[in-house]
């Protein structure tokens, strides 16, 4: 059963959804159940995938990895999301862009998540 803010992906066509309200039925695409994307379960270099959150004067800067993640046509970060106080903020990225996002919000506790097209879903909290 899908829960709020979970990410699901279709293993056939690549469709990805974020659950806005949990329901009682599984998510289906291309005739099969979509796969829940669990953070940090793919065997990959953590130093290039775990988001790094920096508090700034305007809010928060989220960078992907302690070592900058590549942003090539074949390997890139698709999006960065910041969750705070029951709200979700997302920046979508393209190959060639810098894998970071600034979110101008005030909050005491935040969670940053990102999605790598090859190595999946990663998160950290501050």
Curated annotation (Swiss-Prot):
One of its GO terms (molecular function) is iron ion binding. Catalyzes the one-electron reduction of superoxide anion radical to hydrogen peroxide at a nonheme ferrous iron center. Plays a fundamental role in case of oxidative stress via its superoxide detoxification activity. Is organized in two protein domains. The N-terminal domain has a fold similar to that of desulforedoxin and contains a mononuclear Fe(3+) ion, center I. The second domain contains a different mononuclear iron center, center II, with a Fe(2+) ion. Its cofactor is Fe(3+); Cu(2+). InterPro entries: Desulfoferrodoxin_Fe-bd_dom (IPR002742), Desulfoferrodoxin_Fe-bd_dom_sf (IPR036073), Desulfoferrodoxin_N (IPR004462), Desulfoferrodoxin_N_sf (IPR038094), Desulfoferrodoxin_rbo (IPR004793), Desulfoferrodoxin_SOR (IPR051233). It comes from Oleidesulfovibrio alaskensis (strain ATCC BAA-1058 / DSM 17464 / G20). It catalyses: reduced [rubredoxin] + superoxide + 2 H(+) = oxidized [rubredoxin] + H2O2. Fe cation 1 binds at residues 10, 13, 29-30. The keyword Cell wall biogenesis/degradation does not apply. PANTHER family: SUPEROXIDE REDUCTASE-RELATED (PTHR36541:SF1). Binds 1 Fe(3+) ion per subunit. The iron ion 1 is coordinated via 4 cysteine residues. Catalysis occurs at center II. Fe(2+) ion of center II is the electron donor and is converted to the Fe(3+) form during the reaction. It comes from the Bacteria. It is an enzyme of class 1 (oxidoreductase). Its EC number is 1.15.1.2. This is Desulfoferrodoxin.
């Amino acid at each position: 059963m899908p829960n709020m803010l979970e990410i699901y992906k279709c293993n056939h066509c690549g469709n990805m959804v974020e659950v806005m309200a949990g329901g009682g039925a599984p998510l289906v695409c291309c005739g099969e159940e979509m796969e829940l994307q669990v953070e940090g379960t793919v065997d990959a270099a953590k130093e290039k995938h775990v988001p790094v959150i920096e508090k700034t004067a305007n809010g928060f800067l989220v960078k992907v990895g302690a070592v900058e993640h590549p942003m090539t046509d074949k390997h890139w970060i698709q999006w960065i999301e910041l969750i705070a106080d029951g709200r979700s903020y997302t920046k979508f990225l393209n190959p060639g862009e810098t894998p970071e996002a600034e979110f101008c919000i005030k909050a005491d506790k935040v969670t940053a998540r990102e999605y790598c097209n090859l190595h999946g879903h990663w998160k950290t909290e501050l």
